[in-house]
Amino acid sequence: MAESSGSPHRLLYKQVGSPHWKETFRQGCLERMRNSRHRLLNKYRQAAGSTPGTASDRLLVQEVMEEEWASLQSVENCPEALLQLELPLDLAVLQDIEQELCNEEKSIISEYEEDLEFDESCLRRMLAEWEANSLICPVCIKYNLRIMNSVVTCPCGLHIPVHSTDLTEQKLRACLEENVNEHSVHCPHTPVFSVTGGTEEKPSLLMNCLTCDTWAVIL
C-alpha cells in the first residue's frame, strides 16, 4: 500500500536538519531501538522466527524512526530552529540511519537466538543428567542429591526436611522432570532452582523462570 504524502514516514524525507540534528536523530533512533528490545522480540516470535531483514522485521525500524522524529518535533524537545526547517533532507542520511537500525535489530535478534540456544542446551543437559543413575542437584547442577531419613541433602549446602517418608530419588526425579517439561511447553528458557526459608520457616525447593515469571514449589 502506498504511503500518503502526509504520513510520518514520508515526512522524514521532507525535512532537513543540520549535522547536529541529524546526529541527534540518529542517536535517538538507536537508543529507542535498544529500549524497544521487548517489542522487537515479540514481533520476531509472532513471525515464527522469520529471517531478520525482511519487510516485516524492518517494520519496527520504520516505527522507531517515525516515533523519534515525532519526539524531536514536539514542543518540549524541539528548538524553534528545527521547526523552521523546510529543505529536503538528504536521503542518503536517512538510508544510512535506517541501515544502522536494521543492523541493530539483527544484532538484538541474534543475541536472543544465542541465548535461546544456550538455554535449550542447558535444559537438555539437565534432563540428561536427571535420567542418569544419580540424581543431580537442580540448584548447583554439580553434586548428587541424597535422601536419608526424610531429608534431601546436597554437598552444596541444600538441606530440606520433607514430610513424606516414602520419598525416593526416583520420585523426586519424576517430580523435577514433570515440572521442567510442563514449563518447557510454554517457555523455551531454562528455569532455575533455589531454596527458600530460614531458621523459623521450613525450607522449600522452588523452580522459577526469570523470563516468563512462573514458579512452582517442588518440595
Curated annotation (Swiss-Prot):
A zinc finger (RIP-type) spans 137-212. One of its GO terms (cellular component) is cytoplasm. It holds the Pfam family RPA_interact_C. Sumoylated; required for localization in the nuclear PML body and transport of RPA complex in PML body. Upon UV irradiation and during S phase, it is desumoylated, releasing RPA complex that is translocated to sites of DNA damage. Sumoylation takes place at different Lys residues. GO terms for molecular function: protein-containing complex binding; zinc ion binding. Keywords: Metal-binding, Nucleus, Phosphoprotein, Ubl conjugation, Zinc, Zinc-finger. One of its GO terms (biological process) is response to UV. Interacts with the RPA1 subunit of RPA complex. Mediates the import of RPA complex into the nucleus, possibly via some interaction with importin beta. Sumoylation mediates the localization of RPA complex into the PML body of the nucleus, thereby participating in RPA function in DNA metabolism. This is RPA-interacting protein.
